[in-house]
Amino acid sequence: MALSAEDRALVRALWKKLGSNVGVYTTEALERTFLAFPATKTYFSHLDLSPGSSQVRAHGQKVADALSLAVERLDDLPHALSALSHLHACQLRVDPASFQLLGHCLLVTLARHYPGDFSPALQASLDKFLSHVISALVSEYR
């Protein structure tokens, strides 16, 4: 399902509103993912996964940077995320289902922090956006 002009506008507007806090929200989403889906911790056994740890915050910022790049390059997600796709598929060997779990937790996190903005239309647009990001990230798995 392609992102419509309205989807793109809604995603970009929210991302602009998030501003420099994107990393805060992606870190919270990671913490939610680890708590709700403990199997996702498997790929991070070398990190301190306690809530608020500097290592979780650092990885949360990496997720934020990747998603911000995706927002900037909505028209070319596969190319924009190709290096990350290769890294996760070929080197880290992350289960592709983990991306969907993190995406779900990010939606929950954003809805919690922006309840007045989180309309059904925004939720649908973000869900489509995250689906496209996940599709680009798992492209190297095929």
Swiss-Prot record:
Span of domain Globin: 2-142
InterPro entries, sorted: Globin, Globin-like_sf, Globin/Proto, Hemoglobin_a-typ, Hemoglobin_oxygen_transport, Hemoglobin_pi
Presence of the UniProt keyword Iron in the record: yes
Family matches, as PROSITE patterns: GLOBIN
Residues holding heme b: H59, H88
GO cellular component, one term: haptoglobin-hemoglobin complex
Top-level taxonomic group: Eukaryota
Keywords attached to this entry: Heme, Iron, Metal-binding, Oxygen transport, Transport
One Pfam short name: Globin
CDD domains (alphabetical): Hb-alpha-like (cd08927)
Gene Ontology terms for molecular function: heme binding; iron ion binding; oxygen binding; oxygen carrier activity
Family label: Belongs to the globin family.
Protein name, per record: Hemoglobin subunit theta-1
